Amino acid sequence: MKRSRTISMIGAVCTFGLAVATSAVNAADDNQLSVTVAFGRGLNTQGTPVNNVVIPDTIKLKENGVVNFIVAGFHQIVVYNPGKTDDEVVVPGTGTFIDDTNNQFYSGIVPAGGPGALPITTDPSNARNRVESVSFPGPGTYLVICNVRNHFNGGMFAYVQVH
């Protein structure tokens, strides 16, 4: 009798410990100060729609946290302030870039050249295959898009939820 009670207690303690550890991991997922995000699937893909993704497409972050976007290929990160949604982005009918600056929070490196449309100064250029870190100082849901028109039209956008 005493032995079965001891085994039951050990089982209960183990179950409780596992439940606490699991909830701590889930809570940590929503409360990260630094998150790494793939902005493009990778250099081992062709320059096709397969590469034009943001993984994951919902990013959860603590206030004042940082998202490190690992950019693979010809992409430009643009982040909008909370409140703007993907269906509110003004997309021109032609051209390479969208350039909708309304309610814009951050505009990343232009992949066709250096910052601010400067010509490429090195080969290989730092405008492709890079890491861009973006800080999110306030709460809200931020829209992140690829500013390349065809990429955005193909669904290359994500949301950063800051708590």
List each model region and its residues.
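Bacterial N-terminal signal peptides that target proteins for export
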Residues: 2-11
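Serine/threonine-biased, Pro/acidic-interspersed low-complexity stretches characteristic
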Residues: 3-4, 21-28
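Extracytoplasmic copper-binding redox domains, predominantly the cupredoxin/blue-copper superfamily
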Residues: 25-163
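Bacterial N-terminal signal peptides
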Residues: 11-19
